[in-house]
Amino acid sequence: MAILDRVELLERFVQKRGRWCASIEYEWRCSHRALDLLSQVDAQVRNMCGQPIQPDHGDYVDIQLLQDQMRAPGDKRTKHLGEAETIVLIRRRAELAGSIFLTDDSGARTHAAAEPAVNRCLGTTELLAYFEVAGWVTRNVVHADLRALQEADRRVRPSAARDYDRMADDLLLRMKKASRCL
């Protein structure tokens, strides 16, 4: 969301419950510098996520096992570390049970979706659809964001506007049905 300048929308979405683990915070520090994002964006993200959650000694074995399952031959040693750490912390920490896991990594999404402690797994396009359904952005703005992500070589799915439209329309329909059941 930072690359799209949508951090304030992500803040609204997480409702002061955003959290991150130490490895994800480290990845943020590296990408923050690489993307040359403003320090204001860094402050927003840090305020939204709070202090990084540090794994304890008991977490490391599970993190390593999950990371090994996620990595492919030839992947860097740190590949999927942040995702594995996040999933294990959600699994092992009662206060994190029911969390929404945010990632565009398809392998991590598969593992998170199979984790009973994870409520939902959302990627960038799903978040944008939630923002649209909430009335925080328009569909045209989202289409422009999808183009910007493609131009920045970000791999998000769906990336085509018509596929996004179908997903957003489905979400809107589900939300309307859910509100009728209340």
Question: What are the language-model segments listed below?
Answer:
Residues 1-100, 106-182:
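Active-site-proximal, substrate-binding regions of enzyme catalytic domains
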